[in-house]
Amino acid sequence: MSGKREFKSFGSTEETMFSQHHKIPSTSEMYAEPENFLEIEVRNPKTHVPNGVDQRGMYTDYEIICRTNLPNFHKRASRVRRRYSDFEFFRKCLLKEISMLNNPRVVVPHLPGKIYLSNRFSDEVIEERRQGLNRWMQIVAGHPLLQSGSKTLIRFIEDDKFVG
């Protein structure tokens, strides 16, 4: 009978297919730096009391650490400190920049809510806000259109003083 074909189990077919068409990556390739990346983290909150003991001038700022190899960023690593009011101003500037670019595909989420309670400087409240700002920053900085085209994002992440 000339119509008979040799039987191959799925396992042997799969093995043949992968060995012929796919190279198994080496350990250094698996753990190498990705082609394009932006890592960002909001951490290390610090509460400042500029008038000594008087709480009226107290504020908390947060450290933003960024590591990237994206070509439109000026620094490969940056570390800045920002207050909540800086995040508010950044969001406002970002919305203005997006409207000028006329790009409806970029939606900037709302910031975590402002805290008006008397315990706003408690460790628990500050940590909750830090986590919220970290999530917010991950979303905003993670947007591919903002990564590749927002000068406002770059200034907020890299400049010591953010002026918009």
From Swiss-Prot:
Keywords linked to the UniProt accession: Cytoplasm, Golgi apparatus, Lipid-binding, Membrane, Protein transport, Transport
Highest taxon of the lineage: Eukaryota
Function comment: Required for retention of late Golgi membrane proteins. Component of the retrieval machinery that functions by direct interaction with the cytosolic tails of certain TGN membrane proteins during the sorting/budding process at the prevacuolar compartment. Binds phosphatidylinositol 3-phosphate (PtdIns(P3)).
Protein transport among keywords: yes
Origin organism lineage: Eukaryota, Fungi, Dikarya, Ascomycota, Saccharomycotina
Pfam families in the record: PX (PF00787)
One Gene Ontology term of the molecular function aspect: phosphatidylinositol-3-phosphate binding
Signal peptide limits: none
Membrane topology: Peripheral membrane protein
Biased composition (Polar residues): 10-26
Domain PX: 40-163
GO process terms (BP): endocytic recycling; late endosome to Golgi transport; protein transport
InterPro entries: PX_dom, PX_dom_sf, Sorting_Nexin
Annotated organism of origin: Candida glabrata (strain ATCC 2001 / BCRC 20586 / JCM 3761 / NBRC 0622 / NRRL Y-65 / CBS 138) (Yeast)
Annotated compartments: Cytoplasm; Golgi apparatus membrane; Prevacuolar compartment membrane
Binding site for a 1,2-diacyl-sn-glycero-3-phospho-(1D-myo-inositol-3-phosphate): 83, 85, 114, 120, 129
Name of the molecule in the record: Sorting nexin-3
